[in-house]
């Protein structure tokens, strides 16, 4: 008889994001008291959790296969986990979802338009509230008095601080063409 063994790894960041001056806990803390409670629930319900994951994998594979063939479907199934992992989920002071991207391989910007934009199709397909959650921080920062430009911000800070902007507040950095950020915001904004 075969025996299956597994391992669960998790981390608890306690305070997840400093969102415009206020520390916010990760979204999962609204349901679970601590990381052990969350992991325990997932472990206890592992058969259901794995079945739901397999259903999602199958659904995504079939949709991608119909659109672009087997290689495209394989890439979509491979990349959607990376896309989700590149974001942090919290709520703001009004309880609205905030879904912030993290730049992992450059300077650590958070709420970065050019990281979030490529993931928008996935979230439009499965969870449109996350697209709104990507845009809320950008709209909030763009409405601040310190943002005096007529184009979209590149980001809303440096992880885990989402209360400023890495590039835009330094006028010396604003000599280039920043139409890319605005172009990246238009499609999800239209869907908003």
Q: Which sequence ranges carry the predicted segments?
A:
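Helix-terminus loop motifs that line ligand-binding clefts
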Residues: 130-192
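Short, glycine-/Ser/Thr-/acidic-enriched flexible segments
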Residues: 12-14, 125, 190-192
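Solvent-exposed loop and edge beta-strand segments that line ligand/cofactor-binding
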Residues: 99-115, 166-181
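Second-shell loop/turn segments in exported
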Residues: 121
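Short runs of predominantly hydrophobic/aromatic residues within well-ordered alpha helices
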Residues: 72, 76-77, 115, 182-185
């Amino acid at each position: 008889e075969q025996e299956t063994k597994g391992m669960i790894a998790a981390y608890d960041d306690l305070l997840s994001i400093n969102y415009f001056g206020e520390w916010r806990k990760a979204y999962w803390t609204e349901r679970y008291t601590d990381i052990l409670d969350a992991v325990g629930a997932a472990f206890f319900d592992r058969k259901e959790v794995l079945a739901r994951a397999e259903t999602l994998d199958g659904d995504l594979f079939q949709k991608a296969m119909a659109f672009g063939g087997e290689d495209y479907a394989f890439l979509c199934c491979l990349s959607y986990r990376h896309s989700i992992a590149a974001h942090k989920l919290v709520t703001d002071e009004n309880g609205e979802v905030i879904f912030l991207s993290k730049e992992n391989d450059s300077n650590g910007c958070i709420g970065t338009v050019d990281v979030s934009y490529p993931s928008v199709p996935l979230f439009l397909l499965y969870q449109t509230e996350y697209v709104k959650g990507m845009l809320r921080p950008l709209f909030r920062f763009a409405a601040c008095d310190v943002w005096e430009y007529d184009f979209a911000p590149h980001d809303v800070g440096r992880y885990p601080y989402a209360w400023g902007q890495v590039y835009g507040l330094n006028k010396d950095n604003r000599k280039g063409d920043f139409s890319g950020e605005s172009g990246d915001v238009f499609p999800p904004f239209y869907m908003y």
